[in-house]
């Protein structure tokens, strides 16, 4: 996929594998979005692996949309983006040469700060949530990320990180906002506090710095979330169980990685010991 705003996108899908793709010269390389579209179809169980994601630095040329989470918000120079989707595993990808971020994981509050407000209650009742849970980003080869960050959506974050002397712009960004609010009971009854199996985790992604503007472990206040930025190589260092391969049965025949595809690197049968 080349020269698009969204290189390849998984949107409002359950049980999807995105693998063995090349995404380059787009605005954002690989997108996993769960949007509040109100049709009872919302996303989870997505694996992103074995992809080559390089130089997705094209200017965002999408028209504005009435949906605050449309692709018009994608910051140029972003490799992989997860927006308000649960249960996502991102592993064994090559992610290189992105001006803004190699990986971004965000709640929908980044797109609309009122994402748990009255206008969203019918969609929340329909099954959508603005937070991300159980995201595991691990064992990716990430190089040269964040040399020239840009994008209207995250301009405040760019200013915060680049103008704070003890911080520097990270290659991996987690907003932390939804998790902080949920852990402080500020989203009840919409979203409970995160359990261990619902945390956002980053492991073994090389020397890439990880950052967040809102520390999930910091309490929000009555007036709102607490800005508590941090950057480090070992932030959010945890792991989650591997997600199962996605399969599809069509006209009685089953398809999927490890089912009809047994030759791709990640789909080969395990050796018999």
Name each region found by the language model:
Residues 1-6, 14-28, 32, 42-57, ...:
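Right-handed parallel beta-helix
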Residues 27-78, 100-132, 143-188, 208, ...:
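Acidic/polar low-complexity surface segments
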Residues 177-273:
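C-terminal functional modules
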């Amino acid at each position: 996929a080349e020269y698009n705003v969204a290189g390849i996108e998984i949107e409002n899908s359950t049980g999807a594998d995105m693998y063995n793709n090349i995404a380059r010269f787009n605005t954002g390389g690989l997108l996993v979005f769960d949007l509040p579209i109100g049709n009872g179809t919302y996303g989870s169980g997505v694996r992103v692996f074995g992809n080559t994601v390089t130089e997705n630095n094209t200017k965002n040329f999408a028209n504005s949309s009435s949906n605050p989470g449309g692709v018009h918000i994608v910051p140029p120079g972003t490799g992989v983006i997860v927006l308000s989707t649960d249960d996502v595993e991102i592993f064994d990808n090559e992610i290189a040469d992105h001006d803004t971020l190699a990986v971004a994981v965000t709640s929908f509050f980044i797109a609309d700060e009122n994402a748990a407000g009255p206008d969203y209650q019918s969609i929340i009742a329909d099954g959508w949530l603005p937070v991300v849970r159980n995201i595991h980003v691990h064992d990716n080869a990430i190089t040269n990320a964040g040399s020239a960050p840009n994008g209207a959506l995250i301009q405040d974050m760019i200013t915060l990180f680049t103008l704070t002397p003890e911080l520097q712009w990270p290659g991996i960004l987690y907003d932390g906002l939804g998790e902080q609010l949920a852990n402080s009971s500020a989203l009840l009854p919409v979203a409970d506090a995160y359990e261990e199996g619902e945390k956002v985790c980053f492991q073994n992604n090389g020397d890439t710095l990880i950052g967040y503007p809102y520390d999930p472990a910091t309490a929000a206040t009555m007036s709102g979330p607490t800005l508590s930025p941090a950057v480090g190589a070992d932030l959010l260092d945890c792991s989650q169980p591997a997600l199962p391969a996605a399969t599809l049965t069509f006209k009685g025949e089953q398809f999927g990685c490890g089912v009809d595809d047994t030759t791709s690197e990640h789909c080969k049968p395990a050796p018999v010991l």
